[in-house]
Amino acid sequence: MQKKKIFVEIGIPSSIKKRLMQKIVQWKELPVKWMKGENLHITVSFIGYVDESVVPEICQKINEAVADFEAFEIAFDSIELGPNVDDPKIIWFCGKSNKELGKLNEAVEQTLGMRSQKHKEYRPHVTLGRIRKLKWEKLSEKPNINEKINITMTVDSVSVMESKGGGAEYISLEECPLV
């Protein structure tokens, strides 16, 4: 049986993707593997490798898990180094803690039998690029990336996605609308 690499995401509106891609141009010379604009998203839950035969059941369970959720807002406020500024791994677009997103994460993970902390606040982020560690460490002067950018978006659905080609291509398997 073939395995698929599956995750649940919140899509980013194209207008926000465009704005983010315009912002990161100033850092293009850094040793960073930048994400393609079309792949920008918020990961709700990484499910992992599963047999393709169980994908329809996963999609159905996630649809059921999110069926009672109302659309909600997420506020973003900065582009910064993360998760630790002293030893960064990524450059990300960071949001403010969001209880509703934490509940959504919990509902998805509980319905799939994954561990989840109860109603944790969830700080959303969008990975913009992954730092190439060896080249980064050789930089004579490390950049201080902390750019304020206030953007709010509405979450009205989640999608079950398949990642192919080492994360170079994402395929939507199911869109699950919120109420």
Annotate the PLM regions.
Residues 1-179:
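Histidine-dependent nucleotide/RNA phosphoesterase domain, centered on the 2H-phosphoesterase fold
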